[in-house]
């Protein structure tokens, strides 16, 4: 069994080694021929990777913040409580009270009639 698979494995390994050597040779040749350009390209590549990591971290943090704020009680929760501690229901309740009180306050026309009489 080892004799059947070993030629295949050795062929695979030799192909991989050949590809690796040719790639390393090409890289070495490019770096030797254009050292400045290669350095600039590598620098840009590294900067892009760093920026991508920072953006991913910021995006992840915002997503976590949004998820932590998500579980809010439904609007019916505020209606069931006699005195809600949140501003909006109290604000609307005060407005309703003020509008109901305004019906007892005489209008400008009624005040003018009272002043003339």
From Swiss-Prot:
It is a single-pass membrane protein. Interacts with the minor capsid protein M1249L and with the hexon capsid protein p72 capsomers; these interactions form a rigid zipper structure that stabilizes the capsomers. Interacts with host STING1. One of its GO terms (biological process) is symbiont-mediated suppression of host innate immune response. Together with the penton and the other minor capsid proteins (M1249L, p49), forms a complicated network immediately below the outer capsid shell, stabilizing the whole capsid. Three copies of p17 encircle each p72 capsomer in the inner capsid shell, anchoring p72 capsomers on the inner membrane. Required for the assembly of the capsid and icosahedral morphogenesis. Additionally, inhibits the host cGAS-STING pathway through its interaction with STING1 and subsequent interference of the recruitment of downstream components TBK1 and IKBKE. GO terms for cellular component: host cell endoplasmic reticulum membrane; membrane; virion membrane. This is Minor capsid protein p17. It is found in: Virion membrane; Host endoplasmic reticulum membrane. Keywords: Glycoprotein, Host endoplasmic reticulum, Host membrane, Host-virus interaction, Inhibition of host innate immune response by virus, Late protein, Membrane, Transmembrane, Transmembrane helix, Viral immunoevasion, Virion. The chain crosses the membrane at residues 39-59. Glycans are attached at residues 12, 97. The keyword Glycoprotein applies. Belongs to the asfivirus minor capsid protein p17 family. Induction: Expressed in the late phase of the viral replicative cycle. Its main location: virion. It comes from African swine fever virus (isolate Tick/South Africa/Pretoriuskop Pr4/1996) (ASFV). Residues 96-117 are annotated as: Disordered.
């Amino acid at each position: 069994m080892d004799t059947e698979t070993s030629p295949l494995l050795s062929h695979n390994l030799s192909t991989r080694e050949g590809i690796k050597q040719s790639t390393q040779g090409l890289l070495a040749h490019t770096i030797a021929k254009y050292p400045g350009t290669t350095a600039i390209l590598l620098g840009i590549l590294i900067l892009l990777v760093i920026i991508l990591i920072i953006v991913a971290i910021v995006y992840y943090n915002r997503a976590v913040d949004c998820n932590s704020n998500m579980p809010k009680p439904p609007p019916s929760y505020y209606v069931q409580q006699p005195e809600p501690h949140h501003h909006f229901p109290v604000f609307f309740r005060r407005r309703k009270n003020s509008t109901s009180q305004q019906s007892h306050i005489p209008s400008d026309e009624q005040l003018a009639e009272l002043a003339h009489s």
